[in-house]
Amino acid sequence: IVATGAHAASPHAIPGETKLAFGDAVVMDFGARYAGYCSDMTRTVFVGEPSDEARRAYGAIRRANEECEAMLRAGLSGADVHQHAEAVLEEEGFGGAMGHSLGHSVGIDIHEAPNLSPRNPKALCAGNVVTVEPGIYLTGKFGMRLEDYGVVRDTSYEVFTQSTHEMIIIS
């Protein structure tokens, strides 16, 4: 998925005719397949200086991503982690703007169970490979997402994604 501007306000945007504009967020969701297994990551970059609202939104998804990754461990439910992300976005002024589950498992298929979702009360297990992908989608304005994937351990979450969480502005 590559989407920009108001078109990016759809989490699973399909190709369109939207042209890049100064200040736009560009959402890039991609992965690879190796030995039959999938990877998944998303980064959002900006073409020129983003608006104050877009800066605040990016800070909110970054905070939600990093706090959820720091809390993830075996024994928590997918709902526990999802609810934490929603609470962070609410505190940052973007409550209700995520519109999708916080994450999903990745394996032979790109979307597998267990999910980091309000509908998953089951405990995560060590060895589950899951994404953490908070997003904010404001209809008619912009969308953005910050997604990593990694493995749940007994007492932590080991991130596989090797890419910065810093805001990237392309001049």
Listing of model-derived features with the role each one plays in the protein:
Residues 1-171:
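Active-site neighborhoods and metal-handling regions in enzymes and metal-associated proteins
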